[in-house]
């Protein structure tokens, strides 16, 4: 069978598998059924948006001075993210109760070092990590976090905002409606710092997504992925043919090196220029944020505590390209699985100086991500994941990524905005535009 025919069959199989999931994900409740969200400053579904900007305009004196009430058996507590014991409590809560895939096969495994990196960017605030504890025992049963960010949405003024993440409620307490109280409380605490907008993501449909992206996966260790139920064998194929398809060279085609602190200024410049060229909604980085997010203090690649891997390409002593990915392992939940851990790399930010045209930009990005995939494989990662944002749609097929069954909806709180392209067409299939899309990557 020719390579072209094989690719055609595989692509059809992937699309058929993916399309089975789309109808359920498309279902959104009626506006009236969103008992909490209909009380919040968020757009309704299909709302006509004539102009972009804040929905509500409030002042500091409007902010409630005291925490929101909890059921009598629970109490508020602040997580000290510099206290290893508190971080361990957050880890335990997330490990047992946080995001799983629909089939309850995999769960994110946020390590203590990952949480330390994710929750302490420049400008982090001690009061932005509230949790709920059982009053009688002190057991942590719910958590939410906020970190500062700045969002550039098209040509609008820079949006001073926060990213909301790690909203988690103990499984046995989901009927207590603690999540809405957590959201209101973190909103109150953020408002106290004169910040009125937020960015958050969710796999579920809420009022009202500004964009929707889809997960794509590039197998690195296909045999392992097959054995744990992550990958399947398409019709008329064998395990041997799949292993052969996804085999990678050891040598990286580009001359790359690990990013260091000395590269921060150069990376900051090319990253901001690239995001302006390739996205309609992006994070606006400071040099301090570039240093935090992309320069891991652990330099040894094989160290289990290392989280982010960043690389640069130089030409005549000048940094011209940059790419990164981060480690987020998954726990395998199925009892029949022979392995309990999936070592996953997630594509993070990248940038190139090749901005003369959309095609030049996308061709160079394909080379960068092709190198990232090889490096991740050499480091022992078993799958490389990307979303359909930035210029990713232009290389996903060529680099042998397969569409997953996971979607990620992006939301803006207290901000009305026109939709931002998420790399998908109306049927939720891959669509590359020469224009701009989502340029924000949340952990």
Swiss-Prot record:
Record-given protein name: Glycylpeptide N-tetradecanoyltransferase
Oligomeric and partner information: Monomer.
Catalytic reaction annotation: N-terminal glycyl-[protein] + tetradecanoyl-CoA = N-tetradecanoylglycyl-[protein] + CoA + H(+)
Positions contributing to tetradecanoyl-CoA binding: 34-37, 167-169, 175-179
Localization, UniProt: Cytoplasm
Coiled coil: none
Recorded GO MF terms: glycylpeptide N-tetradecanoyltransferase activity
GO cellular component: cytosol
Chief location of this protein within or outside the cell: cytoplasm
The EC number(s) this enzyme carries: 2.3.1.97
InterPro entries, per database record: Acyl_CoA_acyltransferase, NMT, NMT_C, NMT_CS, NMT_N
Function (record text): Adds a myristoyl group to the N-terminal glycine residue of certain cellular proteins.
PANTHER family, A to Z: GLYCYLPEPTIDE N-TETRADECANOYLTRANSFERASE, N-MYRISTOYL TRANSFERASE
EC class: transferase
Keywords, alphabetical: Acyltransferase, Cytoplasm, Transferase
Gene Ontology annotations of biological process type: protein localization to membrane
Family classification: Belongs to the NMT family.
Origin organism lineage: Eukaryota, Fungi, Dikarya, Ascomycota, Saccharomycotina
Gene: NMT1
Active-site residues (renumbered): 443
